């Protein structure tokens, strides 16, 4: 693995991490969390989602959060589940949105209340409208490694969905292990297949840690040339529509490892650990991450 390797890390804790948390954080606490993460050096933070509050009440204050962060809006990404979500994001001044579609109809119906085909059709329209307004669009394919409703997912199926996204003009696609069932060999095989099928796409990875394999899966993806990852401060997260799934790969745990390997990330890990500890106090609950629990209490250097 090249020592000159650089990794781009998208911090999704404020959205993916908080969307299924049992208690809703006050808006000022969310704003403070996003600002604190940006201060760590993240170039992109997924701040919220334009989902209907009926489905995810924890993110009902999306516009208020974005209004409070207008001076840093160019560093924020927002999940938009549909065209109405894009309209809301545009009105809020957002310059980068994320769209998602499942590799299976079973999960897509639970998550977005429509079929994969219908979602892909809407994403094409979203991408066209976003390009018209100079808004960048990133995409993810959820349950790419296994589905809680439809079971095993064939690589060919993932490729078909990803190809439809690429045909719609989307250049950055992340494959998500939404329920945390992937293993390193599967990760390597799927990313190699996708890179051969769609070499012009920039591929990213989004892992959950249900079986404790997220870090190993990250390294496997890294070996295939993937250098774009998503994770969550403290390891919080999980989809309301993926029963039993654990949180996202823990950002500070993974980034500390990458730093120790000499891989550049641009993120101040010591500062991120402090943010994780502050979030743990705010949530008044232990977080799944590990490194933030280590001494010294006030991080000066990150233990190897």
Predicted regions and their residues:
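Catalytic cores and adjacent flexible loops of soluble metabolic enzymes
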Residues: 1-304
